[in-house]
């Protein structure tokens, strides 16, 4: 990330728990945990948009003089991964490694600053099992009496359950089964209780769990434990797509808060909107996913993809289409022509505007408009500052992650 003159200001971010914008004010080091992929398929544009959002946070923090400790998990053991491997007759470990490698290649192409720590769920299982046992001993978790060895979290153990998502119980019950929950599981104390530990099953991978018995962890506890181990009891940002607000982030925060006794787990719960295709929701079931690797193979400039995804505000659901990409390609071309001019209007005002827009809840559309204004002026011969094109180029690289 290139150094820029001066420093940016504090970053305001929308927090799902507050349902409003507040300053993210880390002192010295900003800590961020972002839920990564389940590596059974290639990186689609929804993944890319989410990762660009948190890349912008990291860039704005660093520009403000902060160090950043950024952790991202890889859910390298989960039912969808096992199901895809079985369908394709492939070893699940090989599938996970291949798709994780492709994801990282896609992120590099999009100029995402990598996390300081990429952590797989599998490597974290011993720590996760230990924390699940702690919850059992504290009375916040229980083992089913059906002989499966399955352990569930008791949501009644935390009176704060629901503070992040602000959903009614009826809404939770509707969403829970759509996002991996099992409200109809016999023997649970509450239909919304999430799985902490799945006891070993025939033909499924499992790991030693000490007093839990062999098995594998549930999804929510994986993220809670990885974040606690690497970032501590409280973090500045927990992030992901807005489909993770409930149950995933609600449950992982509940787990972490019960384990540490500190609230809130995250000072900001930040969620990126979903990406649709031509006005329809983009999903695996619809078969309309657009993959970053496919665009790259079609010789689409990754910087144009990045620009297209930043042309809408991160917090909003938005749509991808050919027109959006074409507009981004034209914008990128104009910026490159402007940056190649021998001189231009002073870029200091542009840098201040760029910083100001990004500090206001990552207003990337406003940031792009500021860059457009400078480029248009430069292209018609306004200004005679020979250093301006270089500063323009460096600012776009550092703050927007766009290399001209």
UniProtKB/Swiss-Prot annotation:
In the record, what terms sit under GO molecular function? ATP binding; cysteine-glucosaminylinositol ligase activity; cysteine-tRNA ligase activity; zinc ion binding
One of the GO BP terms on file: cysteinyl-tRNA aminoacylation
The motif 'ERGGDP' region: which residues? 178-183
Q: Which cofactor does it need?
A: Zn(2+)
Q: Where does L-cysteinyl-5'-AMP bind?
A: 35-38, 50, 73-75, 219, 241-243, 275
For the motif 'HIGH' region, give the residue ranges.
37-47
Where do transmembrane segments lie in this chain?
A: none
Q: Name one GO cellular component term.
A: cytosol
UniProt remark on cofactor binding: Binds 1 zinc ion per subunit.
Entries under CDD domains matching the protein = CysRS_core
Q: Which Pfam families match?
A: tRNA-synt_1e (PF01406)
Residues that, per the record, bind Zn(2+): 35, 223, 248
Q: Which reaction does it catalyse?
A: 1D-myo-inositol 2-amino-2-deoxy-alpha-D-glucopyranoside + L-cysteine + ATP = 1D-myo-inositol 2-(L-cysteinylamino)-2-deoxy-alpha-D-glucopyranoside + AMP + diphosphate + H(+)
InterPro entries, per this entry?
Answer: Cys-tRNA/MSH_ligase, Mycothiol_ligase_MshC, Rossmann-like_a/b/a_fold, tRNA-synt_1_cat_dom
Q: Where is this motif: 'KMSKS' region?
A: 281-285
- Per UniProt, which keywords does this protein have? ATP-binding, Ligase, Metal-binding, Nucleotide-binding, Zinc
> What EC number(s) does the entry state?
6.3.1.13
Q: Which family does it belong to?
A: Belongs to the class-I aminoacyl-tRNA synthetase family. MshC subfamily.
- Its biological function? Catalyzes the ATP-dependent condensation of GlcN-Ins and L-cysteine to form L-Cys-GlcN-Ins.
Q: What is the protein's quaternary organization?
A: Monomer.
State what protein this is by name.
L-cysteine:1D-myo-inositol 2-amino-2-deoxy-alpha-D-glucopyranoside ligase
Which species is this record about? Salinispora tropica (strain ATCC BAA-916 / DSM 44818 / JCM 13857 / NBRC 105044 / CNB-440)
Q: Which gene encodes it?
A: mshC
